[in-house]
Design a protein with these regions (language model features):
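Outer-membrane beta-barrel pore domains
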Residues: 2-185
Length: 185
């Protein structure tokens, strides 16, 4: 059916609330419907934790010009000082903080792909033919390698220090590498 449909947008900012710069993103107009799928894994063994998630989205648009996105992350954590066991919280569907005065080490990797090459080629052809297109210049791939330390003073107070190496490659823009150091209480 012809007519006005919804716009669906995906945006990923860099890892700070101070700088609101969008690292990669896409807004798709004339979206008719969207399918989403996600699978998550949470593994605990004593003082080690492994978490991962995969997500995928398919957006059907007018004239069959669909768009696909996907991504995943994986993180491994371990309590290295005052090792205590991680405990799964069934009510909150997550892992409780470790006991008092524990030091945790974290390694992680995340990947986001907003870059659908087939849709990009069709979009460029449509624009060249004088048909309406969408701005895909900021649609791209983003990866994040992270290392962190968390000190759990008690159940309510945690000190965190994280380092992230973020790489962003959008369709029409230069590749960017960004180093982020975060300290949080």
């Amino acid at each position: 059916s012809k007519g006005k449909h919804a716009a669906i947008g995906y945006n990923k900012r860099y890892l700070t609330v101070v700088d609101k710069t969008v690292a990669t993103g896409v807004t798709l107009t004339d979206a008719r419907w969207e399918n989403k799928f996600t699978a998550e894994f949470q593994g605990l063994y004593r003082n080690f934790q492994l978490s991962s998630q995969y997500y995928w989205s398919h957006i059907a648009r007018e004239v069959g010009n669909s768009y696909n996105t996907d991504g995943f992350y994986v993180s491994a954590r371990g309590i290295v000082v005052n090792p205590g066991n991680y405990k799964y919280n069934f009510a909150g569907s997550g892992v409780d903080n470790p006991d008092n005065k524990n030091l945790e080490v974290m390694l992680g990797y995340g990947y986001l792909n907003l870059r659908d090459g087939d849709a990009y080629a069709k979009n460029k052809a449509a624009i060249a033919a004088g048909l309406p297109g969408v701005d895909l210049s900021k649609a791209g791939r983003m990866s994040d390698v992270s290392v962190g330390l968390s000190y759990f003073l008690n159940k309510y107070v945690t000190f965190r220090l994280n380092y992230h190496f973020v790489t962003v490659k959008n369709f029409d823009l230069e590749k960017k590498n960004v180093n982020v150091l975060q300290a949080r209480v």
